[in-house]
UniProtKB/Swiss-Prot annotation:
Its EC number is 7.1.1.-. Keywords: Cell inner membrane, Cell membrane, Membrane, NAD, Quinone, Translocase, Transmembrane, Transmembrane helix, Transport, Ubiquinone. NDH-1 shuttles electrons from NADH, via FMN and iron-sulfur (Fe-S) centers, to quinones in the respiratory chain. The immediate electron acceptor for the enzyme in this species is believed to be ubiquinone. Couples the redox reaction to proton translocation (for every two electrons transferred, four hydrogen ions are translocated across the cytoplasmic membrane), and thus conserves the redox energy in a proton gradient. The gene is nuoK. InterPro entries: NADH_UbQ_OxRdtase_chain4L/K, NUOK/Mnh_C1-like. NDH-1 is composed of 14 different subunits. Subunits NuoA, H, J, K, L, M, N constitute the membrane sector of the complex. GO terms for biological process: ATP synthesis coupled electron transport. This is NADH-quinone oxidoreductase subunit K. PANTHER family: NADH-UBIQUINONE OXIDOREDUCTASE CHAIN 4L (PTHR11434:SF16), NADH-UBIQUINONE OXIDOREDUCTASE SUBUNIT ND4L (PTHR11434). It catalyses: a quinone + NADH + 5 H(+)(in) = a quinol + NAD(+) + 4 H(+)(out).
Protein backbone atom coordinates (compact mmCIF):
# COMPACT_ATOMS: atom_id res chain seq x y z
CA UNK A 1 0.00 0.00 0.00
CA UNK A 2 1.50 3.31 -1.07
CA UNK A 3 1.45 6.13 1.43
CA UNK A 4 2.25 9.81 1.18
CA UNK A 5 5.83 10.58 2.25
CA UNK A 6 6.09 12.19 5.66
CA UNK A 7 7.66 15.41 4.41
CA UNK A 8 5.06 15.99 1.71
CA UNK A 9 2.16 15.23 4.02
CA UNK A 10 3.43 17.57 6.71
CA UNK A 11 4.07 20.23 4.06
CA UNK A 12 0.45 19.91 2.95
CA UNK A 13 -0.70 20.22 6.56
CA UNK A 14 1.49 23.30 7.06
CA UNK A 15 0.14 24.93 3.90
CA UNK A 16 -3.46 24.25 4.98
CA UNK A 17 -2.72 25.62 8.44
CA UNK A 18 -1.11 28.74 6.98
CA UNK A 19 -4.12 29.31 4.69
CA UNK A 20 -6.45 29.02 7.67
CA UNK A 21 -4.31 31.37 9.73
CA UNK A 22 -4.28 33.95 6.95
CA UNK A 23 -8.05 33.63 6.71
CA UNK A 24 -8.45 34.28 10.43
CA UNK A 25 -6.09 37.24 10.42
CA UNK A 26 -7.28 38.90 7.19
CA UNK A 27 -11.05 38.34 7.14
CA UNK A 28 -13.36 40.35 9.38
CA UNK A 29 -16.52 38.34 8.66
CA UNK A 30 -17.24 36.03 11.59
CA UNK A 31 -18.44 33.15 9.40
CA UNK A 32 -15.29 33.25 7.28
CA UNK A 33 -13.20 33.37 10.44
CA UNK A 34 -15.02 30.30 11.75
CA UNK A 35 -14.44 28.46 8.47
CA UNK A 36 -10.76 29.40 8.59
CA UNK A 37 -10.54 27.94 12.09
CA UNK A 38 -12.02 24.74 10.72
CA UNK A 39 -9.36 24.64 8.01
CA UNK A 40 -6.70 25.01 10.70
CA UNK A 41 -8.19 22.15 12.73
CA UNK A 42 -8.35 19.95 9.64
CA UNK A 43 -4.70 20.73 8.93
CA UNK A 44 -3.82 19.45 12.38
CA UNK A 45 -5.87 16.34 11.64
CA UNK A 46 -3.99 15.78 8.38
CA UNK A 47 -0.72 16.02 10.29
CA UNK A 48 -1.96 13.36 12.73
CA UNK A 49 -3.02 11.07 9.88
CA UNK A 50 0.31 11.44 8.07
CA UNK A 51 2.32 10.83 11.23
CA UNK A 52 0.22 7.80 12.11
CA UNK A 53 0.65 6.37 8.61
CA UNK A 54 4.41 6.91 8.77
CA UNK A 55 4.79 4.71 11.85
CA UNK A 56 1.94 2.32 10.90
CA UNK A 57 0.03 3.23 14.03
CA UNK A 58 -3.72 3.78 14.36
CA UNK A 59 -3.09 6.56 16.88
CA UNK A 60 -3.12 9.19 14.14
CA UNK A 61 -6.57 8.13 13.02
CA UNK A 62 -7.83 8.10 16.60
CA UNK A 63 -6.51 11.62 17.12
CA UNK A 64 -8.16 12.71 13.86
CA UNK A 65 -11.52 11.47 15.14
CA UNK A 66 -10.90 13.47 18.32
CA UNK A 67 -10.08 16.56 16.24
CA UNK A 68 -13.29 16.06 14.22
CA UNK A 69 -15.43 15.88 17.36
CA UNK A 70 -13.68 18.94 18.76
CA UNK A 71 -14.31 20.78 15.49
CA UNK A 72 -18.00 19.84 15.58
CA UNK A 73 -18.34 21.16 19.12
CA UNK A 74 -16.45 24.32 18.20
CA UNK A 75 -18.71 24.96 15.20
CA UNK A 76 -21.90 24.47 17.19
CA UNK A 77 -20.82 26.85 19.96
CA UNK A 78 -19.35 29.32 17.47
CA UNK A 79 -22.48 29.42 15.33
CA UNK A 80 -24.66 29.86 18.40
CA UNK A 81 -22.55 32.81 19.53
CA UNK A 82 -22.58 34.32 16.05
CA UNK A 83 -26.39 34.04 15.91
CA UNK A 84 -26.75 35.71 19.31
CA UNK A 85 -24.42 38.51 18.27
CA UNK A 86 -26.23 38.90 14.95
CA UNK A 87 -29.53 39.40 16.79
CA UNK A 88 -28.06 42.31 18.75
CA UNK A 89 -25.99 43.81 15.95
CA UNK A 90 -27.28 42.97 12.45
CA UNK A 91 -23.82 42.55 10.95
CA UNK A 92 -21.22 39.80 10.84
CA UNK A 93 -18.25 42.16 11.10
CA UNK A 94 -15.94 41.13 13.93
CA UNK A 95 -15.07 44.74 14.75
CA UNK A 96 -18.74 45.59 15.36
CA UNK A 97 -18.72 43.52 18.54
CA UNK A 98 -16.42 45.98 20.31
CA UNK A 99 -19.39 47.99 21.56
CA UNK A 100 -21.11 45.07 23.30
CA UNK A 101 -21.29 45.06 27.07
CA UNK A 102 -21.69 42.20 29.48
Amino acid sequence: MATVPLGQGLLLAAILFALGLVGVLVRRNLLFMLMSLEVMLNAAGVAFIVAGARWASPDGQIMFILVLTLAAAEVSVGLALILLMHRRIPTLDADAGDGLRG
